[in-house]
Amino acid sequence: MSSFQQGVSGLNAASKNLEVIGNNVANSNTVGFKQSRAEFGDMYAAALNRAGTSNVGIGVSVQAVTQQFNQGNITATSNPLDLAINGNGFFEVKSGAQTVYTRNGQFQTDKDGFISNNQGMKLIGYPIDANGLIQPGAAAPLQLPTGGVAPKVTGSNTIEMNFDARQAITLPAGSPQVDFANAKSYNDATSVTVYDAKGQDVALTYYFQKTSTDNWNVYATANGTSVNVDGAGKPLPVTTMTFQANGGKPTVPLAPVLINIPSTVNAAGATTLAIPGVALDVTRSTQFGSSFGVTSMAQDGYAAGQLAGVSIEKSGVVMATYSNGQSKPAGQVELATFRDPQGLSPQGANLWARTVASGDPVVGVPGSGNLGVLQSGALEESNTDLTGELVNMITAQRIYQANAQTIKTQDQVLQTLVNLR
């Protein structure tokens, strides 16, 4: 009679296996989904004082349905807030007092600027303090800045260039003055945009006039107005440069030179504020027998800017990019791992909750310890092996049919016994 029990248990097990496989197939296109596997064990009736070799099993039972947390394929998207974890870890998301975990990195910003998933749950990470520094350990929902960035007045201007040692001395006869309208009164020129305290742009132009074999005068204008003049209003150099005889770096000046930029009217017709004490650094320049050229030009000021975009680095640092070209950290994504991920409780919607079996989460930044790294503008696909699952489905179907045949055969045997006379 145990054949009936064996067959029924086989039908139940095969049915459960088909349910698991069907769920895997149904979620083969679900972002961050982890496929499950039904695990079975045989069953025996309890029999005391009986040799083990004479026991006959009474069927099969489902021991567990376990999730397989192997890595899914990563595909690129056009949303910079889409995140894929390459390696171990879960995103931590929160709604009210409920904290759950997910591998689904489909994020966007809500009306308040919080990074959240499509259920409105906020992504947890490390925010920035008042000084713009990331606060490790102070986990909280990540929020993008909603305002702009204030302007910064230019405080330094570093220029690295080469002066052509072959050029002729251009100092006009009888006068050391330069005429900005006369290109023959200077050898070379270069320009840079600097900013006043209001973020208004100022066109700062430098003119270089060779006065002897290794000496150059450096003049400057702001929006066409000389920044240094004598009592008669005629231009004066802001500094002079003296080079070594071998053409190496200058011996004068050896340190940045402070220049004061007066209030002027810029190209937009706006009256700009004076910019005092701009440190002009030309100490890395050279004078060789090659054409004049600017190798690098840098200044540290900028105009006001509005939030223009966001990017997330592989370490989880969220960078806010502004319309003035500036970028600032807005926080850092936190990841969590568990001693036993199999112990996590599936909550649906690609979410898991911690349990006693899983242990408490161990949190950290991406790339630290055994945590994976993030890929921005990408998503982790379902790890369902669709081809393999379709094969498993056919196998489970055949097993179901075979167990049904076991019951049918046993019924025929019993019918034969009943018909005996």
Protein language model annotation of sequence segments:
Residues 7, 11-14, 29-40, 326, ...:
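Alpha-helical heptad-repeat coiled-coil segments that mediate oligomerization/polymerization in large
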Residues 403:
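Acidic/polar, glycine-anchored loop/turn motif associated with catalytic or activation segments
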